[in-house]
Amino acid sequence: ISIEDVEMQATLLDTPTANAIRSTLPLERTVNTWGHELYFDVGISGETEVDASTIVQIGDLAFWPPGSAFCIFFGRTPASQSNEIRSASPVNIIGSINNPPINKLRRIRTGTAIRIAVTS
């Protein structure tokens, strides 16, 4: 995952949603921000999976079905309560960033280009 000078390695899970997104890669988009979440449309539709959740962890990659959006979580969002990280509505967890560079991610603004590709 590349955003400006931020290069990150991530692991995708073997789930129907993760595999659908994997099939769209490489992908270049511009990000939107919502608190400490980056998200962008990936142009696929998907259902909310049975293990979808609104509570996520730092570094989680997720798919938000209502917005057909790929989400990168790195801290609290406007929906968070206390110290939790909460999505707007249930998301399908599709993977995670290995050692997320939280301070660098906090500098990313809406409209910044992102590129996601499979490296191995």
Where in this protein do the model-derived segments appear?
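Short, basic/aromatic beta-hairpin or loop at an interaction surface
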Residues: 29-42, 82-96
